[in-house]
Swiss-Prot record:
Single GO biological process annotation from the record: tetrahydrofolate biosynthetic process
Domain DHFR: 3-183
Source species of the chain: Aedes albopictus (Asian tiger mosquito)
Keywords (A to Z) from UniProt: NADP, One-carbon metabolism, Oxidoreductase
PANTHER family hit by this protein: DIHYDROFOLATE REDUCTASE (PTHR48069:SF3)
Phylogenetic classification of the source organism: Eukaryota, Metazoa, Ecdysozoa, Arthropoda, Hexapoda
Gene Ontology, cellular component aspect: mitochondrion
Protein name: Dihydrofolate reductase
């Protein structure tokens, strides 16, 4: 059973989105998201990203599905929207994880990333398979209508990976910092 990690950018008021979009424009932070969710050790494999329907359709049409990763969309009504053949549509997180544990995907996927939105993050954080949260802490408040769930004491802040900068980043006058939380084994 593969563990998974979450990746998210959160502003000072806990916000992660507004009207299906990001409230900020941080090109380097988006590059970090792309690099982290594509990073593999085995060149014969790729990563999977799991997201809710609204998160998927929040990605500009020209950029979806997100390249070089298996895009898995969670939706209660798979027939309500048309999806490209290269994405996998599941009705639950449980179904998606089950498919990732079975052939052929178990041999093709290296890492699994949860990329939003709120309900998907919340369910993922409660799972025993949740390993880490890669959180970009944006040091400013933005108007948001979607929020990241509270990080409970089940998670502790850990040292950043070698390829994750520890110092404060700044872009377009907005400061942010990369943090990693790891789930404490029970």
């Amino acid at each position: 059973m593969k563990k998974f990690s979450l990746i998210v950018a959160v502003c000072a008021n806990g916000g992660i989105g507004i009207k299906g979009d990001l409230p900020w424009r941080l090109r380097q932070e988006l590059k970090y998201f792309s690099r982290m969710t594509k990073k593999i050790q085995d060149s014969g494999k790729r990563n999977a990203i799991i997201m809710g329907r609204k998160t998927y359709f929040g990605v500009p049409e020209s950029k979806r599905p997100l390249p070089e990763r298996l895009n898995i969309i969670l939706t209660r009504d798979p027939s309500a929207n048309a999806y490209p053949s290269e994405v996998m549509v599941c009705t639950s997180m449980q179904e998606a994880l089950k498919k990732l544990d079975e052939a052929p995907l178990v041999n093709e996927i290296e890492n699994v990333w949860i990329v939003g939105g709120n309900a998907v993050y919340k369910e993922a954080m409660q799972s025993d398979r949740c390993h880490r949260i890669y959180l970009t802490e944006i040091k400013e408040t933005f108007e948001c209508d979607a929020f990241f769930p509270e990080i409970t004491s089940d998670f502790q802040l850990v040292k950043n990976d070698d390829d994750v900068p520890e110092d404060i980043q700044e872009e377009n006058g907005i400061q942010y910092q990369y943090r990693i939380y790891e789930k404490v084994p029970k």
